[in-house]
Amino acid sequence: MIRLYNTKTLQIEEFKPIHEGHVDMYVCGPTVYNYAHIGNARPMIVFDVLKRLFEAEGYSVTYVSNFTDVDDKIIKKAAEENTTEAVIAQRYIDAYQEVRTLLNTELPDITPRVTETMDKIIEFIDKLVKTGHAYEANGDVYFSVESVPTYGEISHQHLDQLEAGARIETNDQKKNPYDFALWKKTDMGIKWNSPWGEGRPGWHTECVVMINDNIGDCIDIHGGGMDLKFPHHENEAAQQEAMHGNTLANYWVHNAMVNIDGQKMSKSLGNTMWAKDVVLSLGTNLTRWLVSSVHYRKELNFSDETIETARKELDKVLTPLKQAYIKAALANYVMGDDYDKESYRAFLDCLDDDMNTPNAYAIIFETVKKLNQTLRQREIDFAQVALYRNAVEKMLNVLGIVVDKPVIGETEKELFAKWNQAKADKDFDSADKYRNELVEKGLL
């Protein structure tokens, strides 16, 4: 039984899908005007692990994540580079997908773009205007938050508790300071014709329409970073309530932010860490291990200390797996697919509890300890070795961490034999030579 913390209810709830055995999940994607930073990478990993968990528990998953390829920042960059918005957007979409691949994430099944959904966005806004939930003002269109009594249910703030200017745009055209733009009149950059004149859509409408268009009127899980809870997800939910009279998602799941050396990552501090640079520097496995080492609802700190701690932890896990594989191969023992089901089940139970990765890591360490104890026996029970090793590999697979299996052919077996014989003969020069060759092959 999978249980998730629902931001909307402030409770950890049993997951009950709309369609039995299937999960529909939408995660807000990037506005593509720059490269992905490590803060963008966290939800990539968090929701990839969640998807893998559902699949491990027997669910099928439809995973949708959008690209916002229309935005003032994209238009500004296109003007600065004397090119089109489409060129800018495609550059950063390609870069974003590259990071997803480098992180070994399972790519979303559907990646809709705003520009490909424009007709339906305009139709959606027009219906909101005609039903009295939105109004036109000098070519702009605003959503009336007072028209939806449930406004504030995602961020748990009532209108009278909100502070004007807190991540919202204020102007004299609005009937209420918290009314938000559905359509923006413009004569600059890319624009589309609409019943209200030329313009482009507001950010908050795009995701609702893409969810309705690609999945349906209600989805199982809507995910994203905690910074999207208000106003973005709040405004999405309000539009859905106004249009269809129902909740947009049954479970709202948000990951916490990423800090750098204990400080918030920001341009002003100059401490932005680009995701591609991090992965190329640390490697896929270490990056994923570090990100998942902290519960997704707690802030994650990137520092030399946390990186080194994660490196040591991961080495303690992967090294015994490699040793087990090599020793079995040298003993001509072929490991099957069977695994320690009790340990693997305990691991999944931890993740089923609101993706409690720290507790899941404890199960990994416990199983690795059993593996090490078995490997130290005078007469190694390779059947038991295989059970523990395969269980840990399955656990790591759910976390998106790849376990390499070294090639152990006759050449490698002969090299091990020469190394062992040289040590037995106390021929240390030869032993060092053979050992170095084994190290170069990644076998030691």
What is each residue range found by the language model?
Residues 67-71, 92-96, 106-121, 139-148:
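Short, glycine/charge-rich beta-strand/loop segments that flank catalytic centers
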